[in-house]
Every structure is written in structure tokens, then in C-alpha cells.
Amino acid sequence: MDNFKAVYKILAALEAGMDQPQFDAEQIAPEVLGVSKERWAKYLQMMQDVGYINGVEVHTYITGVSVNTKNIAITLKGLEYLQENSMMQKAYRAIKGIRDIVPGI
């Protein structure tokens, strides 16, 4: 999966989960996103570093990576990212739809 698509999907799931008492982190599991656990952990760490999410604990050990998403949440900056990129997503879907209909594009 494209890196930015994965980031967008994570943020979108967290935004949708704001209406729930507890976020189900299985919605953004590496298997769901189609990425390795290591890449997924790096996505979460980077997103936390830039302020899009908070509440994530990432620990790297010799045996692998451990990620605690119990308190994961989207931040205001993460919501702004979603808002700014929603137009890009709409354009992408429109282009993809045209490409599916018109052969050779």
C-alpha cells in the first residue's frame, strides 16, 4: 500500500472512531493495511512525532517491535490533515472511476 494512503486510512479510522467510547485498533492493524508490523510501527511513530496522533507507545527490541495503541487518538493537527487531503482523495476517486470506465487511460 502507498505510504500516504496508509497514513490517510489510519487517520480516517481514528476520526471515525471519535464517536465510540473506545477505539478498536484492529481497524488499523498492519494486516488490514497490508503492511509489515515494522512499517506500521514506523507510520504510527512518525504520525505521533509530527503531531497527527497521540497515545502511541513504540518500543524496538532485538526480537522485534512492540506497539501499544491502547490510548491512540487523532489530534487537531490530524483532523486538519484529513480536511486538507479530502479534496485530493475526491480527485483520486474521480480519476480512478474514469480510468475504470475508459480503457487505455
Residue ranges, per PLM feature:
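Short amphipathic alpha-helical interface segments
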Residues: N3-V32
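Generic structural signal for hydrophobic core residues of well-folded globular domains
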Residues: L11-G17, M47, L82-N85
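Amphipathic alpha-helical interaction segments
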Residues: P21, G51-G55, N85, Q89
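Short, surface-exposed loop/turn segments at secondary-structure junctions
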Residues: A25-P30, H59-V65
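Short amphipathic alpha-helical interaction segments
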Residues: L33-V56, T69
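Short, amphipathic alpha-helical interaction segments positioned at domain boundaries
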Residues: I62-G97
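Short acidic DE-rich linear segments
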Residues: I98-I105
